[in-house]
C-alpha cells in the first residue's frame, strides 16, 4: 500500500447516484486504501442515500470518510418554484455534527419542498443552514463554471454571462460559507474544462478563494468505463447503439491515484494540498449505535402524562403508566382464564414488566399499544399477532396480540432476551385496505417530519442484470431470455462463486456449465456476461419498504436521517435503508397490510347484513370438529396460510384435529421440514404408525403437542433449559447460534450442555445424542409464537368457510376482483362448493361481491353470490355509488327508468359501455347490441334529463320549482337491432369481467375436445412442480407480434383461453410459423414445460398440436407439488359456464332398451348425489331423441357412478 498525504478525492459518485455512479462502496474502500489515500468524500447526486454505508465501510478500512453530496441549487427565493427548470450543481461537505445535521436538513428539503424533476435547494435555505458545511463550485454544471463557460453554445443560449457574473456568484458563496468555500477545477481532457481553467485560477488570485483539484469520479477502475455507460443506458431505457443517448465524451472518470492527480495538476500543486485542508477540517464522528457496546435509545411515548390525565390518573413517566395499563389489561383477560391459574399469569406478567422496564422499552410498548388501540376503536381490523411478540403476556394484556402465550406454551424470552440487549420487534398486521389510515394517524399524532416509511434499493441481481445488459446490447429477446434462464433458480444466487466464512459458495458459472459454453461461443453473450459481472448487485432504483415505519417522538427525523419523498405514494421516506436506521438511533415499527384481514372484515359485514349476527372470534370453540373436518378434507382454498396445493396434501395426510395441529401445520409446511423427514415423522406418530418415544421423561410435556418431534425454536430452548440447566436467555442465544450454524459456539455449548445434564442427574451420552438431534432439527425449527398467531387467522377463515361459505367466498372474490385469473380460480372453487354466482346486474349487484336470496325452480329461497359492479372493468366508483343509492328507492324497471333516475354527470359513456357489455343492463327492454349502438343517444338523453332537472329545481324557471325533479320518464327512439352472436357476447363479457358469463368460447367444440386425459388446467399452473411437462388445451384469443430490434426476427405472445381462465405463452419464429399452418379459430393443445422466472411458475412452449395430432400423443400426467393431486386422473374437461352454472340441467343419454333395474340404479345414485341441477333422461331411438324430466336434483358427482355413459348439459 502506498502512502499519500497530499490528495483526497472530493468529488465522487457511488452506486447511490442510481445507475449514474458505479462505484460499489466496498470495492471503492479497498481501492482507496490500496492507493494510499487516508481520506475520501462521497458526493452523490442530490442525495445522502449511501452516507452511512459509505461511512462504516471507509472506517472499516481505516480511511477517514467525508460525508457530502452534490446538491442541485436554483435561484428562486421560493424553494418549491416551478418557474425555472435551470439548476446548478454545488458540492457540500459536513465538517462536524452541526454540519451533518444541516446537510441532512438540506437534502430533506430538496426532496420534500424543492423537488422539480430533481431535488433542489436554494440560496435562501443555504444561508440559513450553512453552519458546519464546506462548499465547492463543483463541475461544469456548477453555477460559477456555467457562467465562465461562454465557449459553450448552449450556455450562451441559456444565459451564461461570463467572468464578471461568475466572480459575483463566487463572492456570494464566499459570503455564505466564508473560508469554507472553494473553487473546483477538473482536468478530464474536455475542451470546456480547459477553457475555464485559467479563469478559475485568475478568480482565485482576485478573490483569495482557494482552488481544489478534483476528478469527477463515477467508477473505480479505468476499464469500468464501458460498464458504467451500460448502466446509464439501463437507467434511460436506451441501447448502446441509440444515437443521441447521454454518454461521457472521455473515459477519465475513475479513481485516479495521487500520482496521476499530481501529474495532471503539476502547475498548481496547492490545488491538491487544499483537498487535504478540507479533509483536515472535516472532523465529523457519527455516534453509531449497536446492540452490544452502544445500544440504541429506546423511543419515548411522549404522551404518557396527557393520557393518564384523561383517565383521571397521574403518571409522569412511561414506565409507571405502562405497568398500570398492562395490569389493567390482564384483569380483563383473566375473565376467560380459570381462577386457579390467575396467580401464574400475574407472576409471569410482573416478570415481563420488570424485564421490559429494565431494558427501557415501556415507551416502545406504549407506542404499539396506542396505534393498535386507535385501529380497533376505528374499526380497522388488526391481526391477532405476528412473530415473537405473541410470546409476551404483556403484549396479550395490552391487546397488542390476541393469543394467550401461557395456553400455548409460548416463551417471552423468544421476544425479549434479558441476557442479550436487542430492540423489540413487534410486527402488526392491519386490514390491507385501511393500513394507510394508521400511518396517517401516526403522522397526525407525532408530526409530519417525525414519522417516515423506509427506503429500499432494488439491486441488479443475477437474472435481472443479464436481462438488463442484454437489452442494452441489443441481444435478441429469445437469446436474452434463454441466457437469463440458465441462471439457476436458487435464493441468493450470484453470477460467480465467492468465499464466505471459509466456505466457497458456488455461483451460476460453477453450477451451470452451459453458461461457460455460451459465453465462449458467442461474442455478444461474452460482452453481456462481462458487463453483468461488473454491474451485478449495483443499486438499480429506490423503492419503499412494504411495512417499516420509523417514529421519533422527540424531534424531527432529519436530525438522524435525511428524508426522501416517494414518487409512488407521495409519502415521506427515510433516505437511509433499514440496515442503517438502528445505527443512527431510529427504531422501526412494521405495519403490514394483510389481505386476509380485509377478507374476514368483508365476510363479517356480509354476515351481519344477511343474518344480523356479530361473529366473536375470541369466543369460538377452538375444538369445533366441523372446522377441522373442512381442513382435513383439503378443501382449503381461501383459508389463510394453508390453501396451496402443497398444504392441501399435507392437510389430508396429517388430518389436524386440534389447534396445536394447525400451529404445527404452518410450521411444517416449508421446504426444509418437508425434505428433512420431519413431516413424515410427525404424521406417522400422530396416526400411530410410529411409536412416540422421549429420550428423557422430562421432554414429554415439551414435545407431546408435536408427537415427540422437534418442530419449534421454543422447543429447542425448553430442551436446553430442562435437560442442560441453561436459563431461557442462554437457551435463546444457543438457538440463534444454531440458526446461524456457528460451529464454534455450538461445539463449546455442547460440552456445557452435556455437563449441565450430568449435574442434573442425566446420562451424559444420552444428552450428547440429544444435542446432536437438536442441532439437526434446529435449522428447520420455526417460531411457534408466529405460527400460533397465524394459526388463529387460519382457524378463523376455516370457521367462516365452514359455517358461512357464501359470505366468505363472496369476500374472497371481492379481494381478488382486480385479478382476472384469481377471480376465475375462486369462481371455480365456488362451483365446487355448489354455490351459484349470479352475473352482474344493476338491480341485484352491490359494489362488491355480495350474497342475496333468490327463488329457485321450486319457489324456495336459495342463497347465491352476486357479482359485484366494482369488478366490472372501467365503470368506476362514483357511477356505481350513484346507481346503488338510487336503486334503494326501487329497482330499475326499464332502460328509460334507469336513465331518468341516474346522475349522468357521473355516469359517462366510458362507464356505461362496460355495464352494457358485461350484461349488467340486461332485461331492461333492449339487447346489448342495440344499447351499444346507441350509447351516445342514451348519454345525450341522460344529460338532457339532468339539465331539465337542474332548471326545474332552480326556482327561477318559467315553471317555478318542481319538487322531486322530472316525474315523466325519458322516451328513447331506438330501433331494435337484435342481439350479437354468441362469440361477440362472450368477447364483450371477457373484456369487462375477465371471465365468460353466457358460455365459453370452447362450448361449440365440446364434442371435439372430449376424451383427452391428463390435461392441465390454467388455474393449476402454479401447483405444478418446476421442470414438469404439461399439456394444456385452449383457444388462442389474441396473438401480438413484434420484430426483434437486432435480429430482425419475429416473436410475440399469445393469449390463450381454456375452460378455467387465461394463460400467456411466448412465441418465437418457429412457433409463429407453426401457427400459420394451424386453424387458430379452433382449440389447440400446447405442450409446455414449467419453468421458474422471478420465483413465479411460467410456461415454456415446446410444441403446438391440433386436436387430431394431439389424440395420437400419449399425454403423461403432470407432476404436482401436492402428492394427492398427482393421483388424480384428469379426464375430460368438465363443462364450465363460469357463472350461474349450477342452474344448468344435467342429462344422461340412454338407449331406448334401457332396463328398469338400471333406471332404479340411476335414482339411487341421484339420491346419493343430491344437488341443484335438474336431472333429465335423453332416450335415443334410431335417429330420434326424447327428453324426459325427472323430479330429481343432482350434482356433478353422479357422473362418477356412470362413467361409461354420455352426459350433456342443458340450458
From Swiss-Prot:
Entry's Gene Ontology molecular function annotations: 3'-5' exonuclease activity; DNA-directed DNA polymerase activity
Keyword annotations from UniProtKB, A to Z: Cytoplasm, DNA replication, DNA-directed DNA polymerase, Nucleotidyltransferase, Transferase
Catalytic activity from the UniProt record: DNA(n) + a 2'-deoxyribonucleoside 5'-triphosphate = DNA(n+1) + diphosphate
Assigned GO CC terms: cytoplasm
Subcellular location: Cytoplasm
Gene3D superfamilies xrefs: 1.10.150.870, Bacterial DNA polymerase III alpha subunit, thumb domain, Metal-dependent hydrolases
Primary localisation category: cytoplasm
An individual GO BP term: DNA replication
InterPro entries: DNA_pol3_alpha_NTPase_dom, DNA_pol3_alpha_thumb_dom, DNA_pol3_finger, DnaE2/DnaE/PolC, DNAPol_HHH, PHP_dom, Pol/His_phosphatase_N, Pol/histidinol_Pase-like
EC numbers: 2.7.7.7
Known partners and oligomeric status: DNA polymerase III contains a core (composed of alpha, epsilon and theta chains) that associates with a tau subunit. This core dimerizes to form the PolIII' complex. PolIII' associates with the gamma complex (composed of gamma, delta, delta', psi and chi chains) and with the beta chain to form the complete DNA polymerase III complex.
NCBIfam families: polc, PRK05673.1
Protein family per UniProt: Belongs to the DNA polymerase type-C family. DnaE subfamily.
Function in brief: DNA polymerase III is a complex, multichain enzyme responsible for most of the replicative synthesis in bacteria. This DNA polymerase also exhibits 3' to 5' exonuclease activity. The alpha chain is the DNA polymerase.
Protein's name according to its UniProt entry: DNA polymerase III subunit alpha
Organism: Helicobacter pylori (strain J99 / ATCC 700824)
Higher taxonomy: Bacteria, Pseudomonadati, Campylobacterota, Epsilonproteobacteria, Campylobacterales
